[in-house]
Amino acid sequence: ANGAFTVKPGLGRVPAWNPSQNSERGILAQSMSVQGLLTRDPSDLDLAMPILSKNDPVDPFHVPLPYDMGSRNSKCKVALARETPGFETHPEIYKGLELAADALRDAGHEVVEVDPPLILETAMAGYRALMGEVIELLGPDIRKFGSSEINRIFDEYFKQFKPYTGTDLLKILAKRSYYAREWSIFLTKY
C-alpha cells in the first residue's frame, strides 16, 4: 500500500548466487532465498522480470520457466488475511489492506477474508529452525565480526525463537513438507 510494485517469485524462479560467499549456505537459507524487484509500476516488472529470471547455471536450483505463464485476464479468488499473531497491526496497514481489497473487487476478483493455515505454528517452527541453522553455521562469524548491536539483536532472536538443535532440528526440517503442503492446499483455493 505504498505505491510500489513487487514480485517475489518462489524458489528457483530467479537464479541466485553470491560470488563473495566463503561457504555454502544452510538448507533453510537456500530454500528461503528468493530474488525479485521493487518497481514504479507493473509494466516495469513485466520489462525486467524476464531478464532477471534468465537461466544461470551457477544456481543449480534455478528452474528456467518463462515469466509470463499465461493470461492475467482471468478473475481469481483472493485471500485477505488480517491475522498477525503476537504483533499489533497499525491501523494504517489495515486501511491499506482495505484499499487493496477494494481495488481487487473493483477489478472483478472475489476477495475472501480468511485465516491462513497454521500461521503461528508455521512461523514459530520456521524461525526456531532458522535460528538453529544460524547459530551453527553463522554463529561464530556473528560473534567475531558482528557489532555489539548485531550481537544483541541475535541474542534477542535466540531468546525469542529458541533454536532447534540436533535431532529436534532434523525433525522440524522434515516437518517443513507438512507446513508447505498445508500452504500449497490453501494457495490452490486463493
Language model segments and positions:
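Short connector loops at secondary-structure junctions
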Residues: 109-126, 158-159
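Short helix-loop capping/hinge segments that flank enzyme active sites or metal/cofactor-binding pockets
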Residues: 72-81, 128-184
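Alpha-helix boundary/capping residues
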Residues: 11, 21, 51-55, 145, ...
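Acyltransferase
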Residues: 89-116, 138-148, 169-190
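Charge-dense, low-complexity intrinsically disordered segments
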Residues: 32, 36-39, 87-91, 121, ...
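Short low-complexity, flexible loop/linker segments enriched in glycine and/or proline
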Residues: 2-5, 121, 125-131
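Short coil/turn connectors at secondary-structure junctions
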Residues: 2, 74-75, 189-190
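A short helix-breaking turn/cap at a secondary-structure junction
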Residues: 5-100, 118
